[in-house]
């Protein structure tokens, strides 16, 4: 059995938490996040910690409590520090540039690709071959980065495409005659 739910989430200074039934709102320096948690979880705030527990008589209550704890912990980290994903474009002529609230990509297609950014997500291009996606919602930052990567995933022979900065692309050997 996982014991994730047994550890309380510590609320750092400068972060405000509001509980309204199963809805939790966390406000901090980087923004505000709201989430409705599963009914199988009992949430309570004690001083500067949030404690999670299972509701009696629910089969998978401990699993749901662990999931809720992980989600709330990510919300607290997000509004306090924020999350970042870095992407690298590798290939001849592959470029990225900001166009207002969208990322413009040149990825070898016959047309340029523009990806509009959702609210709460910021992106910047320090160089033409790098994209840095930042925001306070971990799930949304990861989803935007995955969407940008999906336009041209790294191919296995030369490794060309859009990749995460920490991603290792395994390359295959070309077919021999």
Curated annotation (Swiss-Prot):
Pfam families: Ribosomal_L6 (PF00347)
NCBIfam families: L6_bact
GO cellular component, one term: cytosolic large ribosomal subunit
Single GO term (MF): rRNA binding
Organism (species): Aliivibrio fischeri (strain ATCC 700601 / ES114) (Vibrio fischeri)
Keywords: Ribonucleoprotein, Ribosomal protein, RNA-binding, rRNA-binding
SUPFAM superfamilies xref list: Ribosomal protein L6
Function: This protein binds to the 23S rRNA, and is important in its secondary structure. It is located near the subunit interface in the base of the L7/L12 stalk, and near the tRNA binding site of the peptidyltransferase center.
Stated name of the protein: Large ribosomal subunit protein uL6
Keyword tRNA-binding: no
Subunit structure: Part of the 50S ribosomal subunit.
Positions in coiled-coil regions: none
Keyword check for Magnesium: no
GO BP term, pick one: cytoplasmic translation
Superkingdom of origin: Bacteria
Family: Belongs to the universal ribosomal protein uL6 family.
């Amino acid at each position: 059995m996982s014991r994730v739910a047994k550890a309380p989430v510590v609320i750092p200074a400068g972060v405000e938490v509001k509980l309204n039934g199963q809805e939790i709102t966390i406000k901090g320096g980087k923004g505000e996040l709201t989430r409705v948690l599963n009914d199988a979880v009992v949430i309570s705030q004690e001083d500067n910690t949030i404690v999670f527990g299972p509701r009696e008589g629910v089969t998978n209550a401990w699993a749901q409590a662990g999931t809720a704890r992980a989600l709330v912990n990510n919300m607290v980290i997000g509004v306090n520090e924020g999350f970042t994903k870095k992407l690298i474009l590798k290939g001849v002529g592959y470029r990225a540039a900001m166009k207002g609230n969208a990322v413009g990509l040149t990825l070898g297609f016959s047309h340029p690709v523009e990806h509009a950014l959702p609210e709460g997500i910021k992106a910047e291009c320090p160089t033409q071959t790098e994209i840095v996606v930042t925001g306070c919602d971990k799930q949304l930052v990861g989803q935007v980065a995955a969407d940008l990567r999906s336009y041209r995933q790294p191919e296995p022979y030369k490794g060309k495409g859009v990749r995460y900065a920490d991603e290792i692309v395994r390359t295959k050997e070309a077919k021999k005659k």
